[in-house]
Design a protein with these regions (language model features):
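Active-site metal-binding motif and surrounding structural segment of the metallo-beta-lactamase
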Residues: 30-78, 172-184
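A short, acidic, amphipathic alpha-helical segment used as a generic capping/interface helix at domain edges
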Residues: 168-173, 192-201
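Short amphipathic alpha-helical segments
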Residues: 37-39, 56-59, 81-84, 158-159, ...
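Core dinuclear metal-dependent hydrolase active-site scaffold
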Residues: 1-39, 97-179, 243-252
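Short active-site oxyanion
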Residues: 4-5, 23, 65-69, 209-210
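Structural motif
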Residues: 25, 45, 70, 144-147, ...
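Binuclear metal-ion centers of metallo-dependent hydrolases, dominated by the metallo-beta-lactamase
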Residues: 8-12, 87-118, 196-252
Length: 252
């Protein structure tokens, strides 16, 4: 029986993957979250605590009755940072409400190498060349990879040694992924002419059938440039750069 998957662009590196039975939302920090979820279950995934990938307002999301949060270790520690609290603070009214809010949620900490299954989707945390994790996951017979801040971050001012180290670290992580059907990967214009080093290697080694460029913030023209200058065999690059842009996948 055919199923549909709607992938909707929210902002920067945030997407919602809207299956018939669940919605998976990655790295939300601003924009409009899904409102009409009906009886679908919702999974928020947060790869790290950078301000352009995480907003604690996700814990105030009330449009679904069944919500699970999968977060990296640094985000988890930020949520449950009790080492910095003393007994007086714990007894404060605001902090009690904060504890109630977070303990009432299903929050799963996912460290590199760990896996978890939620609502029929299987998630595995892989490494990053920046902060936090990247995520490989399988859902509804499809294989996905969401890079988070995993990229070949080679900057103009880097030394040759730094560039070589970054290349080695990046390739080491990419080699762990394997084939995927759908990938989400940075094309950051701040890297200038090196912006496609990471995504080129990802496509070459992981052979995604569909690729979603991300991490371009206020410069969406990089997506047009990327599509105009790259023609990957067997891989469709999706041009989604405005909020609510949607791409539909039919699952057979």
């Amino acid at each position: 029986m055919e199923q549909s998957l709607n992938i909707r662009y929210i902002y920067h590196s945030s997407f919602s993957l809207e299956f018939e039975d669940k919605i998976i939302i990655f790295d939300y920090f601003q924009g409009t979250l899904p409102k009409n979820v009906n009886d679908k279950k919702v999974i928020f995934v947060v790869t790290h605590s950078h301000a352009d990938h995480y907003n604690e307002s996700i814990f105030d999301y009330e449009n679904a009755s069944d919500i699970t949060y999968i977060v990296s270790e640094d985000v988890y520690e930020e949520i449950f940072d009790y080492d910095t609290k003393d007994n007086v603070v714990f007894l404060g009214e605001d902090n009690i409400e904060d504890l109630k809010k977070h303990f009432g949620k299903k929050v799963i900490k996912l460290e590199v190498g760990e896996s978890t299954s939620v609502y029929g989707a299987d998630f595995t945390a892989l490494g990053s060349t920046d902060m936090g994790i990247s995520v490989y996951f399988e859902a509804n017979h499809l294989k996905f990879f969401f890079a988070g801040d995993l990229n070949n971050w080679v900057w103009e001012e880097d030394t040759e040694e730094e560039k070589e180290k970054m290349q080695q670290d990046f390739s080491k992580e990419i080699d762990k992924i394997g084939h995927v059907d759908i990938g989400f990967f940075p094309v950051d214009p701040r890297l200038k002419e090196r912006y496609d080093l990471g995504v080129n290697e990802f496509v070459d080694k992981c052979n995604p059938k569909v690729l979603f460029p991300m991490h371009f913030t206020k410069d969406p023209t990089i997506v047009d440039t990327f599509i105009d200058t790259h023609d990957y065999e067997g891989c469709k690059v999706v041009n989604m750069k405005k909020e609510h842009d949607t791409f539909q996948v039919i699952i057979k």
